[in-house]
């Protein structure tokens, strides 16, 4: 869940240590043009730093020179921008760190396609990152669970500080809602209706595609 305290804004976390695994810069044997990385576990400063660094590397190495006709060694050499893939499986994490990854994805996808793949669970902060892939290149496993919910938080301190923190929580939620609306087929009003249920809202892979979090199920 998205939580706010005087130090951090967090989403629901698990006990597992966050992992960002850099899989390849050269691509798989099946598709050498696709480079991959994995975001697995909680989204926090450490995992956000690692996935951002990986995305920057993959973006900086996206352009390559290839034969226009691979079967003809004498064909013209052309410049090709190779996409990369981020595999996401997370229960959520820190909202600020989510936004740092999201903003980097927005910047990079202007020049390089980002394929996003959701597996296992894509919840809370993870839903925005799944949806932030290049339109038409976002996919989700048929058994993947998706969950969205409202920002939550807690603080201890003088009343004036608590009032200030509450205002900030509201700002974070409004920003989160607007970003989801920008990346999915949902309107701001639809998202707010879901969040007003004041509970975790779970979606099947089919529902996630219908609402625009992903484009296809595998």
Predicted feature descriptions by range:
Residues 1-218:
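Terminal-region recognition feature
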């Amino acid at each position: 869940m998205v939580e706010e305290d005087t130090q951090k804004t967090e989403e629901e976390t698990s006990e597992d240590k966050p992992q960002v695994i850099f899989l390849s810069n050269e691509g798989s044997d099946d598709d050498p043009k696709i480079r991959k990385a994995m975001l697995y576990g909680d989204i926090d400063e450490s995992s956000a730093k690692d996935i951002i660094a990986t995305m920057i590397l993959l973006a900086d190495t996206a352009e390559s020179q290839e034969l226009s006709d691979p079967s003809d060694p004498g064909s013209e050499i052309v410049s090709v921008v190779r996409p990369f893939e981020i595999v996401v499986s997370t229960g959520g994490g820190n909202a600020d760190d989510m936004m740092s990854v999201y903003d980097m994805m927005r910047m990079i996808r202007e020049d390089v396609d980002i394929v996003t793949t959701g597996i296992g669970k894509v919840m809370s902060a993870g839903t925005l990152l799944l949806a932030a892939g290049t339109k038409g290149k976002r996919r989700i496993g048929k058994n993947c669970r998706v969950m969205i919910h409202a920002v939550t938080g807690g603080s201890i301190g003088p009343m004036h500080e608590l009032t200030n923190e509450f205002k900030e929580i509201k700002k974070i939620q409004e920003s989160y809602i607007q970003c989801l609306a920008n990346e999915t087929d949902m309107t701001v009003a639809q998202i707010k209706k879901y969040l007003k249920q004041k509970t975790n809202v779970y979606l099947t892979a089919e529902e996630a595609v219908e609402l625009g979090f992903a484009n296809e199920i595998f």
